[in-house]
């Protein structure tokens, strides 16, 4: 899963974040929305052909058009370095023809809101950079 990226450095996750953005944009353009799109539900591997992703917990999916805004909102639950999320969202926004600065600002705001609310009800067992 993507859990191992929680403490990684930018040079370790930069290409992974961009590849994940391509994967997310691709499934969204194919009208697939995983409602629990989080690091624990995304399996990945890298080989000579690049990065490969697979989703688990697939009983929580919607099928139908995924707007750019809905797709961006779907990226709010990533933890770990903010830079990972910034790279992911910037690349996703480019692929969906959105303004990258506005997309990053929107997702970071929603990310902070999500984790603040989550932290009121649950213990967060890792360092969270908001």
Per-range role (PLM):
Residues 1-15:
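Conserved structural core of kinase catalytic domains
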Residues 6, 36, 46, 62-64:
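Activation segment
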Residues 23-32:
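Protein kinase catalytic-loop region centered on the HRD/HxD motif
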Residues 32-39:
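Catalytic-loop of the protein kinase fold
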Residues 41-55:
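Conserved protein kinase catalytic/activation segment
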Residues 51-127:
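C-lobe/activation-segment region of protein kinase-like
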């Amino acid at each position: 899963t993507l859990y191992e990226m929680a403490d990684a450095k930018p040079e370790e996750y930069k290409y992974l974040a961009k590849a994940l953005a391509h994967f997310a944009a691709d499934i969204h353009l194919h009208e697939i929305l995983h409602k629990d799109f989080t690091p624990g539900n995304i399996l990945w591997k890298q080989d000579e052909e690049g990065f490969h992703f697979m989703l688990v917990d697939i009983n929580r999916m919607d099928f139908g058009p995924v707007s750019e805004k809905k797709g961006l909102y779907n990226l709010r639950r990533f933890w770990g370095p903010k830079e990972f999320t910034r790279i992911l969202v910037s690349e996703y926004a480019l692929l969906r023809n959105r303004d990258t600065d506005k997309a990053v600002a929107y997702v970071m705001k929603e990310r902070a809101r999500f984790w603040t609310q989550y932290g009121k009800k649950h213990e967060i067992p890792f360092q969270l950079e908001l």
